[in-house]
């Protein structure tokens, strides 16, 4: 078993353990492998180990990888855009990705809707919440959620699937859980209003257990699978 396959198995075990401890089934939590800055060869190793959902933060890099695997005839992969989205890059996301986790304003949602090719299924979108109210991060407040969700739900080429957040780093489990629970409450409310909503993208390597205990349905894990990132390229 190579390193990536071994790492994936360990991460899946951690997810299963975290789910079991709070009475949830492991299948309720999707593992999103964050492959930003990693070469296609690393993704190929993850695919060989059964991984199908991948997250990319940089539009151009992600599109190159998507094209690489399409040209190689590899099907059944899911590509999630999880980085900050600028208006001038929205067309590439709309044309190539299956999911966008970082919708935080109507302007971006409208552009994605207009630019999504008609022959593709609707782009699955998550509304990004700035749950820790950090100026350095994208996302809306929970107070602004209802209005934006209602507007996105009207766009025919987008499918509102839920919420995403990147909480501020917290070392204590109790604090992590308290923040995650705020997201879980908002997610539960959203689910009652929109039948397509089923995804709470919350939790990374350091806070995954608390996120799963609070109700996360998707965790985003990178370094624990692929190793340290090289940002020099």
Language model features with spans:
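Expand to "…catalyze enediolate/carbanion chemistry for C-C bond making/breaking, isomerization
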Residues: 210-213, 221, 225-233
């Amino acid at each position: 078993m190579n390193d990536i396959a071994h790492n994936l198995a360990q991460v899946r075990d951690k997810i299963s353990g975290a789910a079991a401890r709070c009475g949830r089934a492991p299948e309720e939590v999707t593992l999103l492998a964050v492959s930003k800055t990693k070469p296609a060869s690393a993704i190929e190793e993850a695919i060989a180990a059964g991984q199908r959902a991948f997250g990319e933060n940089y539009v151009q890099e992600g599109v190159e990888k998507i094209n690489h695997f399409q040209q190689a005839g590899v099907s059944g992969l899911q590509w999630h855009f999880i980085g900050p989205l600028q208006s001038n890059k929205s067309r590439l996301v709309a044309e190539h990705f299956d999911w966008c986790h970082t919708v935080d304003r109507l302007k971006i949602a409208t552009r994605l809707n207009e630019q999504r090719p008609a022959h593709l299924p609707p782009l699955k979108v998550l509304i990004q919440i700035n749950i820790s109210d950090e100026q350095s991060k994208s996302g809306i407040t929970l107070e602004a959620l209802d209005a934006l969700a209602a507007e996105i739900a009207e766009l025919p080429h987008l499918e509102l699937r839920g919420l995403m957040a990147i909480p501020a780093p917290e070392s204590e489990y109790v604090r992590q859980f308290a923040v995650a629970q705020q997201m879980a409450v908002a997610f539960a409310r959203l689910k009652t209003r929109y039948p397509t909503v089923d995804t709470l993208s919350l939790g990374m390597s350091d806070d995954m257990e608390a996120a799963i205990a609070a109700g996360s349905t998707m965790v985003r894990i990178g370094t624990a699978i692929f190793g340290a990132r090289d940002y020099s390229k």
